[in-house]
């Protein structure tokens, strides 16, 4: 019997999970109870490993074709720690980014650092900067060392606390840029139980249609996520921030048992090929964490919406859910506003699965991703590739199950 065209797909998403079932009762996700599954996904990738050397040798036409094919390959992996200080209202993230583009011709690491307040009158610490990292001394599955940054997972379980291990982040960047100087980070994080959706946290993309009945397909082109929805962070962050007067003022942030989220994300294709839009939530309170991430594939890959979320209570996962093409369990914009410059309709009130809503989103950053490009290049990107990427970031006091906390929300529009 011939297969119909409706049995063919170009996108194979993660498995759906019924959030009402008890945690650990589903075969559609894998719980993470030690640090090993948190290792760099790209480290062992023979195509993109940092220590992989690109050969200039070619073997005639086939070698040239291989180089041309590799030139289209791209992969980005980020390991991000979001922190939410419930006492001071200061929030932010420390992110280590690894990228390989043009089949590995360019490879490198970057540190992204952002701090913002949850209240409109708390902007003194606001900063968002990126730093290219040179002099890489070590890149192992669970450890990265450069001249200025150490990012390392430690197998220090604490059964009494319930932690699966620790993450240590140390940074010393004396000369940064014109906005901040002397960035120093010294954090130690206790990580609690995490999870990844099956298969292996991956959503796969295909250039040609494949049969839906093939359960074991995979592709180098993918979106992959590994989640640790709850952790506790202790340590210090300090930097000198440039004031309007031109002088620099020292800022010091002391974190004591501050709730955090850790997220590992891999994107094995260009951003505009992976998704047309994204939504993200990180809510933290004294007892609860609510985490959600959602993306919609472009038209070339069937406009599929994938949503994943979890709820943690007292450092333990109590609910995990995922939805593919089920509108009732996707993110909903309850109220919106139109950006006159970009044309995007962005949320001012939002509802996430898992029972979380925020009716009064407070925009802390509106970022034009192409804004730093020359106007001609930006115009070409918008016209030829049909992309206009904008990120809308929000942070505000919120409630979940009548408990006060702080939520970080992001809505990203690409094409």
UniProtKB/Swiss-Prot annotation:
Keywords: Cytoplasm
Subcellular location: Cytoplasm
Predominant location category: cytoplasm
Source taxon at top rank: Eukaryota
Keyword hit for ATP-binding: no
GO biological process per UniProt: response to oxidative stress
Any one Pfam family match given in the protein's UniProt record, by short name: Svf1_C
Cellular-component GO terms for this entry: cytoplasm
InterPro entries assigned to the protein according to its UniProt record, in alphabetical order: Ceramide-binding_SVF1, Svf1-like_C, Svf1-like_N
Family in the record: Belongs to the SVF1 family.
Note: Present with 1010 molecules/cell in log phase SD medium.
Record protein name field: SVF1-like protein YDR222W
Lineage per the UniProt record: Eukaryota, Fungi, Dikarya, Ascomycota, Saccharomycotina
